[in-house]
């Protein structure tokens, strides 16, 4: 996937086009003073990210406390 990069001034001046690019073409990196500052992604992509993050957090909790939780559930 190609990630477009624009500087802050360009992003601000062309916000609608940058947002459309994030929705239809993939993530857009915003730079400030030559350094990566932020990434704009579509709402759909953000939801997938959030779901994956919650799945990872749940797996980590279960790895640490899974046995205790199963024992409590069996009581």
Curated annotation (Swiss-Prot):
Domain of life, per lineage: Bacteria
GO molecular function: DNA-binding transcription factor activity; DNA-binding transcription repressor activity; sequence-specific DNA binding; transcription cis-regulatory region binding
InterPro entries to which the protein is assigned, alphabetical: Antitoxin_Phd/YefM, phD/YefM_antitoxin, YefM-like_sf
GO cellular component: protein-DNA complex
Keywords for this protein: Toxin-antitoxin system
GO terms under biological process: regulation of DNA-templated transcription
Record-stated family: Belongs to the phD/YefM antitoxin family.
NCBIfam families assigned to the protein according to its UniProt record, in alphabetical order: phd_fam
Protein task: Putative antitoxin component of a toxin-antitoxin (TA) system; its cognate toxin is unknown.
Name of the protein in question: Orphan antitoxin YefM
């Amino acid at each position: 996937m190609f990630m477009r990069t624009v500087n802050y001034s360009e992003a601000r001046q062309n916000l609608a086009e940058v947002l459309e690019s994030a929705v239809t073409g993939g993530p857009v990196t915003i730079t400030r003073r030559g350094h990566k500052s932020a990434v704009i992604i579509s709402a759909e992509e953000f939801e997938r990210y959030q779901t994956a993050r919650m799945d990872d957090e749940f797996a980590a909790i279960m790895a640490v406390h899974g046995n205790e939780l199963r024992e409590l559930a069996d009581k």
